[in-house]
Structures are given as structure tokens and as C-alpha cells.
Amino acid sequence: MVVIVYVIVAYDVNVERVNRVKKFLRRYLNWVQNSLFEGELSSADLEEVKMGLREIINEDEDMVVIYRFRSADAFKREVMGIEKGLGGEEVI
């Protein structure tokens, strides 16, 4: 059985690695804004994302935070201001 989770990935990495992290995450998730991605992943894809990020970042200098939810329905997403990456969301 394939388990699907909804994830939000936020990162603060050295400028030398920002583009590599962004390019890597775009293969799996939707870009929301600078240093923030979200989307649905299988458990296997989530493990691939974590392994790939570990290969890119320097854990002594960088930080990546992964929020994991059972589904996109597990939380409410509200956007204030101009939406950069995803379309069709409610703007408050």
C-alpha cells in the first residue's frame, strides 16, 4: 500500500547551495515562495527527498525543516499578499 503524505519544506541554506536545493525540490514539490515548497509525496519519495537534501546541504551551516501532514485537508492554507508560486488559493 502506498502511503501519501502532504509536506511543507522550508529551508535556510548557504547561498552557494540555494539553487541546488531549489532545483532538487522542484522535481518533487511545488514552489510556493523563496525557500518554501509544498505538495503530496509517497513515503518512498519523502525518503528520497530527505536523502537528496542530506547530500546537498551542510548540516553544520544549513537548516531544512519538513512539516508532514496526513493530507492537505489536515490544515488550512491562507495567503496574505501576492502569491508567488501556486495559483488558485484564497488571498486574505
Curated annotation (Swiss-Prot):
A Pfam cross-reference name: CRISPR_Cas2
UniProt xrefs under CDD domains: Cas2_I_II_III
Assembly and interaction partners: Homodimer, forms a heterotetramer with a Cas1 homodimer.
GO biological process: defense response to virus; maintenance of CRISPR repeat elements
This enzyme's EC code(s): 3.1.-.-
Function summary: CRISPR (clustered regularly interspaced short palindromic repeat), is an adaptive immune system that provides protection against mobile genetic elements (viruses, transposable elements and conjugative plasmids). CRISPR clusters contain sequences complementary to antecedent mobile elements and target invading nucleic acids. CRISPR clusters are transcribed and processed into CRISPR RNA (crRNA). Functions as a ssRNA-specific endoribonuclease. Involved in the integration of spacer DNA into the CRISPR cassette.
UniProt binding sites for Mg(2+): 12
Name by which UniProt lists this protein: CRISPR-associated endoribonuclease Cas2 2
Cofactor dependency: Mg(2+)
Record keywords, A-Z: Antiviral defense, Endonuclease, Hydrolase, Magnesium, Metal-binding, Nuclease
NCBIfam families: cas2
Keyword ATP-binding: no
Entry's family note: Belongs to the CRISPR-associated endoribonuclease Cas2 protein family.
One Gene Ontology molecular-function label: RNA endonuclease activity
Protein source organism: Archaeoglobus fulgidus (strain ATCC 49558 / DSM 4304 / JCM 9628 / NBRC 100126 / VC-16)
